[in-house]
């Protein structure tokens, strides 16, 4: 970390629907500071660590405004993930009640490709960055930790996933064998009615990733997802970053 070989990236594409619908990263999290400010402070404990923010079309403008208003524009690199159109279950373009087409960001699996297309990945490599810590903007427990980075490097793997002990009622992604390959499997891919209490650890969507893994194209799967929009069923195709573990 001290030699500048580690960067931090956060996924900031979501809206805080339970907190007034503003951009999740800029709402107050703790101690009068936003999620974004806390995540930045966690990274900067170790000096001028490169800090990347992946925004969606829904969060980009407000995030840039927030960074500028808090004099943080020069300590973070910001890039956009792609955007897509929702469909009806029959495959037609889904339109909102206003008649406009309905846009969405197609999941955090956009991260590797969007980072490459932004040019930031190449710039990180040129600066000597070898490892990137990726996490959700609202996961304040996922902070830059020399122990985690050291473990990742000592194991010599391209990707290390951070897990948390399963608590009663937890659902979501978890480590599981698919064939003979241990990987992070998203919750909806488990059998219907699966009891997650059987799984000792759950995924946190936090990864230490070797830059070399992100430099190449990776065939992530597209998943069919149904959402309720304006009281109607809309279809989204999404990709998941945890498939990098497969």
Segments and roles (model prediction):
Residues 54, 58, 102-106, 115, ...:
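Residue-level detector of secondary-structure boundary/capping sites
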Residues 98-127, 131-139:
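Conserved adenosine/adenylate-binding substructure
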Residues 1-77, 85, 94-101, 112, ...:
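N-terminal glycine-rich phosphate-binding loop and ensuing alpha1 helix
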Residues 124-136, 141-145, 150-246:
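Catalytic core of tubulin tyrosine ligase-like
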Residues 74-87, 160-166, 230-231:
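A generic structural motif
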Residues 87-91, 169-172:
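Short, charged, surface-exposed secondary-structure boundary motifs
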Residues 13, 56-57, 81-82, 108, ...:
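Fold-independent oxyanion-binding glycine-rich loops
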């Amino acid at each position: 970390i001290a030699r500048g070989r580690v960067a931090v990236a956060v996924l900031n594409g979501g809206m805080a629907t339970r907190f007034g619908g503003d951009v999740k990263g800029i709402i107050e999290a703790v101690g009068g500071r936003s999620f974004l400010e806390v995540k930045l402070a966690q990274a900067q404990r170790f000096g001028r660590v490169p800090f990347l923010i992946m925004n969606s079309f829904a969060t980009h403008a407000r995030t840039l405004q927030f960074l500028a208003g808090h004099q943080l524009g020069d300590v973070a690199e910001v890039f956009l993930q792609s955007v897509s159109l929702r469909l009806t279950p029959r495959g037609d373009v889904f339109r909102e009640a206003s008649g406009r087409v309905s846009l969405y960001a197609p999941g955090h699996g956009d991260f590797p490709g969007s980072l490459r297309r932004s040019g930031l990945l190449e710039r990180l490599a040129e600066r000597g960055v070898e490892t990137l810590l990726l996490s959700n903007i609202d996961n304040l427990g996922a902070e830059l930790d020399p122990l985690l980075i050291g473990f990742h490097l000592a194991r010599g793997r391209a990707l290390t996933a951070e897990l948390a002990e399963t608590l009663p009622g937890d659902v979501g992604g978890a480590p599981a064998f698919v064939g003979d390959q241990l990987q992070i499997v998203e919750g909806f891919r488990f059998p219907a009615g699966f009891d997650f209490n059987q799984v000792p650890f759950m995924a946190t969507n936090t990864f230490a990733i070797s830059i070399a893994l992100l430099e190449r194209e990776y065939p992530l799967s597209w998943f069919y997802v149904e959402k309720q929009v304006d009281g109607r069923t809309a279809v989204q195709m999404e990709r998941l970053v945890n498939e990098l573990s497969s």
